Structures are given as C-alpha cells and as structure tokens.
C-alpha cells in the first residue's frame, strides 16, 4: 500500500505544480523566446509518457529510498537531483539543436524541474510517513 501512496502523492503534487506553473510562467516564457515553433495545443500522449516515466523515476530513486531511510530530506535531495538531470537532458538537447533556444529557457526549466521534483518527493514521503 505504501508504494501506491508514494506514487499517488508524488503524481498529485507534481501535476498540481505543473498545472499552475506551465500556463502561467513557462508557456509565456517559451512563447516569448521560441514563438512560432510551439504547437497551439499540447500533445497529451507524449506529456503523459513523460509524467509516467518521471514519477516512476522519482518513486524508485527518491521516495522509496527516502521512506526506507526515514528521511524526507533525502527524498527531497534525490528528487531534486533527478529533476535536474531529467530537465537538463531536455534543455541541453534542445539548446544544441534548436535555433531559437536560449540560456534563459535552460535555466528556468532546470530550476523548475529540480524544485517540483524535490518538492513532490518530499511531500510524498511525509504523507507516507503519516500513514505508516
């Protein structure tokens, strides 16, 4: 039952954060910099695949070890590191191949990925600890 709590809480926190941040901060920033290269609406399939893979990674590498060790702080750190790595891969690849990419996008997205991933992992472990 505990792994399901970790997965569910991680997903809820992550998706709420994304639902707030993406339309209000990240999309306007991306539109400003890469403008016409963006789709009018999201491709939900690839987005869902990212969320499944990333939340699975957060569960395996951050929340399960954090819960096992009794440390939500370790989950936060490991989650932030995984978020940094995941978002850095995307950003550095995009910066390498896209004409209109910028260091501003790279920094903003990597900071966001680190923060939301760490926060999601931390909250998930705290909630799971409360139910243990």
Tell me the role of every PLM-derived stretch:
Residues 1-132:
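Juxtamembrane/disordered regions of integral membrane proteins
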């Amino acid at each position: 039952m505990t792994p399901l709590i970790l997965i569910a809480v991680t997903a809820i926190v992550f998706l709420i954060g994304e639902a707030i941040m993406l339309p209000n901060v990240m999309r306007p920033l991306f539109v400003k910099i890469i403008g016409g290269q963006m789709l009018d609406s999201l491709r939900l399939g690839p987005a869902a695949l990212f969320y499944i893979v990333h939340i699975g990674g957060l569960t395996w590498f951050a929340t399960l070890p954090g819960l096992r060790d009794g440390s939500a702080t370790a989950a936060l750190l490991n989650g932030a590191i995984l978020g940094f790595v995941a978002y850095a891969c995307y950003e550095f690849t995009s910066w390498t191949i896209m004409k209109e990419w910028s260091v501003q996008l790279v920094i903003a997205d990597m900071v966001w990925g680190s923060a939301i991933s760490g926060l999601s992992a931390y909250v998930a472990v705290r909630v799971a600890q409360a139910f243990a």
